[in-house]
Amino acid sequence: MELHNIRDEYTKRVLSQHDCHKNPISQFEQWQKEAIHAQVNEPTAMNIATVDEQGRPNSRMVLLKEVNEQGFVFFTNYLSRKGGCIERNPYVALTFFWPELERQVRIEGKAVKIPAEQSDKYFATRPYTSRIGAWASEQSAVISNYKSLLAKAALVAAKHPLNVPRPDYWGGYLVVPETVEFWQGRPSRLHDRIRYRKESDNWIRERLSP
């Protein structure tokens, strides 16, 4: 299947280094708000790439649940494949892609577990069925069929008809950024790329060649 002729010309916006915030978190928050306002499909969806013990990368989509001055928070099963990779090598890469705005954000940094109390607080806000699912799913494990998963979920629901506690193996990670790159599509593939990199306690802001 040849895909050579599928291409778009990017013309919607410009990213000026002069107009960027001094802090990448503030710049990200601005872009995140604009993505939500533009009704981008799944504006909080991000790809997270990890590396296993053999140095092989793997990636998957997760949802960003919080941005704060420390970094980017997502939640998952700590016993999943991604959790195992992070346990052995905490350095990860995140990518957001908002095609409606012709924008991409790339983040590299270290993932650390957030305090259990914070995971408890978020878990309590999840829909009941999602909390049941956290107990029923042995994430990344091979299962015989879908019916067995539903049966396990039913057993969990019978045990916890009202309040569902958070499993110890489920919680949040904070990705503490070391580099953050903002990409804005431009005509003729001469895209805008502004990178922030951490040096000591300061952020260095620089333009990259496309």
Curated annotation (Swiss-Prot):
Q: Where does FMN bind?
A: 60-65, 75-76, 81-82, 104, 139-140, 183, 193
- What does the cofactor section's free text say about binding? Binds 1 FMN per subunit.
Q: In which pathway is this protein known to take part?
A: Cofactor metabolism; pyridoxal 5'-phosphate salvage; pyridoxal 5'-phosphate from pyridoxamine 5'-phosphate: step 1/1; Cofactor metabolism; pyridoxal 5'-phosphate salvage; pyridoxal 5'-phosphate from pyridoxine 5'-phosphate: step 1/1
In Gene Ontology terms, what is one molecular function of this protein? pyridoxamine phosphate oxidase activity
Keywords, A to Z, come to: Flavoprotein, FMN, Oxidoreductase, Pyridoxine biosynthesis
Catalytic activity, per the record? pyridoxamine 5'-phosphate + O2 + H2O = pyridoxal 5'-phosphate + H2O2 + NH4(+); pyridoxine 5'-phosphate + O2 = pyridoxal 5'-phosphate + H2O2
Q: Which Pfam families match?
A: PNP_phzG_C, PNPOx_N
Q: Report the superkingdom from the record.
A: Bacteria
**What does this protein need as cofactor?**
FMN
Q: Which residues bind substrate?
A: 7-10, 65, 122, 126, 130, 189-191
State the EC number(s). Answer: 1.4.3.5
One GO biological process this protein is involved in is: pyridoxine biosynthetic process
- PROSITE patterns in the cross-refs: PYRIDOX_OXIDASE
Could you give the subunit structure recorded for this chain?
Homodimer.
Q: Say what the protein does.
A: Catalyzes the oxidation of either pyridoxine 5'-phosphate (PNP) or pyridoxamine 5'-phosphate (PMP) into pyridoxal 5'-phosphate (PLP).
Question: Which PANTHER family does the record cross-reference, listed alphabetically?
Answer: PYRIDOXINE-5'-PHOSPHATE OXIDASE (PTHR10851:SF0), PYRIDOXINE-5-PHOSPHATE OXIDASE (PTHR10851)
> Hey, which family's this protein in?
Belongs to the pyridoxamine 5'-phosphate oxidase family.
Q: Which HAMAP family match?
A: PdxH
Query: Can you name this protein?
Result: Pyridoxine/pyridoxamine 5'-phosphate oxidase
- Naturally occurring in which organism (per UniProt): Haemophilus influenzae (strain 86-028NP)
